[in-house]
Amino acid sequence: MNEARAIARCEEAAALLPPRFRRAALQMPDHRKRYTEEFRLRAGQPPAALLPEGEVTLPYFGADSRVTPRDLAQMVDAVTDYSRYACAETLRQGFLCLHGGFRLGVCGTAMLRNGAVASLRDISSLSLRIVTERIGLAEPTADSLFCACLLYTSPSPRDRSLS
């Protein structure tokens, strides 16, 4: 992925963050935006970005600027268009597929019904993964596979709902 596209994808992901964290993510220097893999919001912790060299705190807040449970709930409500029920199936599995190919990992308290996760409450952290295109990444592996190899995976829950 070229540099301009990587920066644009980071900015698209930042637009999904709660407003006070969105500004910080958008203020990151381009050399950091280019390599940002995900944004992490954990209750009681400062917001962070995951880069190849590790996790870095978004530096544009004071030391007392920490993610609150309200920030987390606000973000989940916003990305589900205020209809968590419509996304309940994937939310029970701990993630949400978002417009633009982004994926939001969700951690909270699982509510069980008959031994299975029925819902999540008390969300404690979110991880917004930035999808990137890596052209040619699998070529070395693909060359060593059998000539007639079929890779199969079941469709995601989102794909099943479209059929």
Regions found by a protein language model. Give the residues of each.
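Conserved ATP-binding/catalytic motifs of P-loop helicase motor domains
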Residues: 163
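Conserved small/polar residues in nucleotide/adenosyl-binding loops
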Residues: 152-159
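Flexible, glycine-rich phosphate/dinucleotide-binding loops
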Residues: 48, 112-113, 160
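A short, sequence-level motif marking secondary-structure junctions
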Residues: 61-67, 109-111, 153
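P-loop NTP-binding catalytic core
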Residues: 84-149
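N-terminal accessory targeting/assembly segments
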Residues: 1-100
